[in-house]
């Protein structure tokens, strides 16, 4: 099956009896190219995608190809069953729960497909050094792109993590796509009232078939943290710099993906990470001592009301959107306001009506760094008088997930406000220091 191919490329490959996963060799522009045919996602209909021996994919136009040869056909039908896992002969210390993403996926070169590593043995083969630090067990809970994550899946992840910890695992590693990982981390953090061990979310910015992949180091250090760290919090463990020296363990409610593709994309905001992990030395260096310690039991309370909305203010936005949201049944709105927490004064009357109808309005800042302070300017004071609740230094995404959790437990508006301002798991930092703000590079660089 020539997945993704159409037009000229489909006709060309079909005429040579080539399928995805077949090994081919060709000559083009004086170069000899040999590799495995991969599925195509190209907008052009004359491109063949080939995986080279070095792990990289290239696109080759069929125009000008000479001496095309099918070297070897290899086709296997692979079925991935959700929840499939292989029983362990001995009790595990760390449970790995896969939800999707590239972190524990591998390329099946016989078919050209990317599939999750299903068994404990496959993960050990992925990075044999894991055997040196922990006994692991692995499970595929589901395999989805992180943009398809939903609150109902958060509950399933939380239940699976609790089960793993109740069974005696020292910690849990959750493999997750990076784009919405921070949302899931916040959801799990609010769902657990106590934990016997850490829940470590881990992902990969570079897929495992690429030489520059961050998958092995991120996974290895996440397992190290899950087993050996003294804290029992929901965290995110990702590269701390662009090289492979260390990873950083971020508190799940104070972290954000701040770059589309860098390996060190995840950064703690208005906070410092919990720990730095030097994976080669197998060392966890604690960066703070105010972490939540391991408890005697795992207490789970995972419920979410999805009738919420994240509203990003911009100049000229029509305040009538608030009326629409109220009429659609929304129970709470998190506003990403400007600066210290502002919208135009045109919103004041609409916010008054919303709060009168029992709708919670919470204010965060688009600046991300710093906290909202709605007592400085007249606009902020007017917004507060209309019923808007300033949410300290909470990240907008964290505030949104927290509101889902709060609304699932409370209906009284005053109590909702009180809960939103309660610092449950470190989502609010009352004291900021200059070190929390990144120092951007200000010296000149020469661009070639």
UniProtKB/Swiss-Prot annotation:
SUPFAM superfamilies associated with the record: GatD N-terminal domain-like, Glutaminase/Asparaginase
Record function comment: Allows the formation of correctly charged Gln-tRNA(Gln) through the transamidation of misacylated Glu-tRNA(Gln) in organisms which lack glutaminyl-tRNA synthetase. The reaction takes place in the presence of glutamine and ATP through an activated gamma-phospho-Glu-tRNA(Gln). The GatDE system is specific for glutamate and does not act on aspartate.
GO biological process: amino acid metabolic process; regulation of translational fidelity; translation
EC number from the UniProt entry: 6.3.5.-
Entry annotated with the keyword Protein biosynthesis: yes
TM stretches of this protein: none
Assembly information from the UniProt record: Heterodimer of GatD and GatE.
Pfam families for the chain: Asparaginase, Asparaginase_C, GatD_N
UniProt enzyme class: ligase
GO MF entry, a single one: glutaminyl-tRNA synthase (glutamine-hydrolyzing) activity
PROSITE patterns per the UniProt record, alphabetical: ASN_GLN_ASE_2, ASN_GLN_ASE_3
Family of the protein in this entry: Belongs to the asparaginase 1 family. GatD subfamily.
The protein, known as: Glutamyl-tRNA(Gln) amidotransferase subunit D
Catalytic activity: L-glutamyl-tRNA(Gln) + L-glutamine + ATP + H2O = L-glutaminyl-tRNA(Gln) + L-glutamate + ADP + phosphate + H(+)
Annotated PANTHER family: 60 KDA LYSOPHOSPHOLIPASE (PTHR11707:SF28), L-ASPARAGINASE (PTHR11707)
Domain Asparaginase/glutaminase: 92-423
């Amino acid at each position: 099956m020539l997945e993704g191919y159409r037009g000229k490329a489909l006709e060309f490959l079909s005429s040579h009896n080539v399928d995805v996963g077949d090994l081919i060799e060709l000559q083009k522009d004086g170069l000899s190219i040999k590799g495995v045919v991969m599925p195509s996602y190209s907008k052009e209909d004359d491109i063949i995608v080939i995986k080279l021996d070095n792990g990289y994919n290239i696109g080759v136009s069929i125009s000008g190809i000479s001496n095309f040869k099918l070297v070897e056909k290899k086709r296997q039908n692979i079925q991935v069953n959700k929840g499939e896992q292989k029983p362990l002969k001995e009790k595990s210390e760390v449970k790995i729960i896969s939800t999707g993403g590239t972190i524990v996926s591998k390329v099946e070169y016989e078919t050209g497909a990317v599939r999750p590593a299903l068994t404990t043995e496959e993960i050990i083969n992925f990075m044999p050094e894991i055997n040196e630090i922990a006994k692991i067990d692995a499970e595929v809970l589901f395999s989805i792109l992180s943009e398809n994550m939903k609150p109902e899946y958060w509950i399933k992840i939380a239940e699976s993590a609790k089960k793993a910890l109740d069974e005696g695992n020292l910690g849990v590693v959750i493999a997750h796509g990076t784009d919405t990982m921070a949302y899931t981390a916040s959801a799990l953090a609010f769902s657990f009232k106590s934990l016997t061990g850490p829940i470590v979310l881990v992902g990969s910015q570079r897929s495992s078939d690429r030489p520059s992949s961050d998958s092995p180091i991120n996974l290895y250090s996440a397992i190290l943290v899950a087993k050996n760290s003294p804290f029992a919090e929901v965290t995110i463990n990702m590269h701390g710099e662009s090289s492979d020296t260390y990873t950083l363990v971020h508190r799940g409610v104070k972290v954000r993906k701040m770059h589309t593709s860098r390996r060190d994309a995840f950064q703690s905001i208005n906070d410092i990470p919990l720990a730095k992990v030097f994976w080669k030395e197998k060392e966890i260096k604690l960066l703070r001592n105010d972490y939540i310690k391991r408890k005697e039991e795992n207490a789970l309370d995972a419920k979410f009301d999805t009738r919420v909305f994240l509203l990003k203010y911009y100049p000229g936005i029509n305040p009538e959107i608030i009326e629409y949201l109220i009429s659609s049944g929304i129970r709470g709105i998190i506003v990403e306001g400007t600066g210290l927490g502002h919208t135009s004064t045109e919103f004041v009357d609409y916010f008054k009506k919303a709060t009168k109808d029992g709708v919670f309005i919470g204010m965060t800042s688009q600046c991300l760094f710093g906290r909202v302070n709605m007592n400085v300017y007249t606009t902020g004071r007017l917004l507060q008088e209309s019923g808007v609740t300033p949410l300290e230094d909470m990240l907008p995404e964290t505030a949104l997930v927290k509101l889902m959790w709060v609304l699932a437990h409370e209906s009284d508006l005053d109590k909702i406000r009180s809960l939103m301002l309660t610092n449950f798991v470190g989502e609010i930092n009352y004291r900021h220091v200059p070190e929390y703000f990144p120092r951007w590079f200000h010296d000149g660089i020469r661009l070639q």
